[in-house]
Each structure stands twice: as structure tokens, then as C-alpha cells.
């Protein structure tokens, strides 16, 4: 089961996202600030973080999707430059969010492990 951390200052956004994601079969936790998110990331191995762009995502090496009420291109570009795998505007289109989550889940489970496989090293031929 994919574990999701929701980081948003709005209680209603946190509750709606948590309830919908749990309904869709995800395991979800929701917090309102960076300190709570960091503490939770130390205890739970999350697969993805959904974070409002106003919040700083914990530096835990976890892929994240940025959420924002600001629809400007500059905000989207800044989020992606800061490491977001996707950028969604509020109000959140749940179908788009679920598609993004499933794609990210696929990448994490299938493509990233390939990057960490040991690549055979080249050993030069030395007959002596």
C-alpha cells in the first residue's frame, strides 16, 4: 500500500485529500507544518508527499507533488525546480491527482530500482 504524507496549512484540504486517498486505497497521514512533517518522515517510510507550495518539504528523499492556489507559470516552474514531480492547482482535480500518484508509484516501484542496480565495471585486459 502506498503511504502518502499530506502537508498543507488548510485543515479542510488535508481532510478532503486524506479521506479521498484512503477511499482509493492509499495509506494517508496529514500534517499542517514542516516540523510535524519532518517528525513523521523519521518514523514512517512515506512513498510520496503532497505539499502546498507555501510549505517546505522535508529533505527526506521522498518524491513529492506540489499543490498551489497560485496558478502562475512562475510558481509551477519554481516547484519543479525545487524537485516536485508534478504541480497541481487548487481546487485539486482528484482524477488528475490520482493519475499523477499512480504514475509516480509506477516510477518509484519499477524505474528507480533499476538506477541503483550495480553496473558491471570495465576491467581492462592485462595478460601479464
Where are these regions (language model features)?
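Two-component/phosphorelay signaling modules centered on CheY-like receiver
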Residues: 11-29
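Active-site beta3 strand of CheY-like receiver
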Residues: 44-55
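Short hydrophobic/Thr-rich beta-strand motif most characteristic of the beta2 strand and flanking loop
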Residues: 25-34, 40
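AAA+ ATPase active-site-proximal loops
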Residues: 116-128
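C-terminal output helix
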Residues: 92-101
